């Protein structure tokens, strides 16, 4: 299971990658593998203000649908429109082309409350 060390993670299997004053968000390799083949992604609206832990998107697979939660509070500033035509990018490249949304955090310091790669690995091991 791939867990890049350059980003933060949540216990609900989202990742958050700081880029300047924004944060790119997607789901982890573990999450996409558990979901199976992704067939649709319901993207949030740009401009929407969200709270940490709020359900902001939905990923639907052949097996199930799963809410995607905001890792920190902030404003959605961009969504990955490529997922409308090719939702399978979430499976093929969960840490790259399969990102879901970008938000501008209310406070970048909130990222410190998230897990690092080692902490996320421990979560996965406790769920196994």
Swiss-Prot record:
Residues found modified as N6-lipoyllysine: 63
Cofactors, names only: (R)-lipoate
Keyword DNA-binding: no
Domain Lipoyl-binding: from-to ranges: 22-104
InterPro entries to which the protein is assigned, alphabetical: 2-oxoA_DH_lipoyl-BS, Biotin_lipoyl, GCV_H, GCV_H/Fam206, GCV_H_sub, Single_hybrid_motif
Keywords: Lipoyl
Function: The glycine cleavage system catalyzes the degradation of glycine. The H protein shuttles the methylamine group of glycine from the P protein to the T protein.
Record-stated family: Belongs to the GcvH family.
Subunit structure: The glycine cleavage system is composed of four proteins: P, T, L and H.
The protein's name: Glycine cleavage system H protein
Organism this protein belongs to: Thermus thermophilus (strain ATCC BAA-163 / DSM 7039 / HB27)
Organismal lineage: Bacteria, Thermotogati, Deinococcota, Deinococci, Thermales
Gene that this sequence comes from: gcvH
């Amino acid at each position: 299971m791939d867990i890049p060390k350059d980003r933060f993670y949540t216990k609900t299997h989202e990742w958050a990658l700081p880029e300047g004053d924004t944060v790119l968000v997607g789901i982890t390799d573990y999450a996409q593998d558990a979901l199976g083949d992704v067939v649709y992604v319901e993207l949030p609206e740009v401009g929407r203000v969200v709270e940490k832990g709020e359900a902001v998107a939905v990923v639907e697979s052949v097996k199930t649908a799963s809410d995607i939660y905001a890792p920190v509070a902030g404003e959605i500033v961009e969504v990955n429109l490529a997922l409308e035509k090719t939702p399978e990018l979430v499976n093929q490249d969960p840490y790259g082309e399969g990102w879901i949304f970008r938000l501008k955090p209310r406070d970048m310091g909130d990222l410190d409350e998230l897990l690092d790669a080692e902490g996320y690995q421990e979560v996965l091991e406790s769920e196994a």
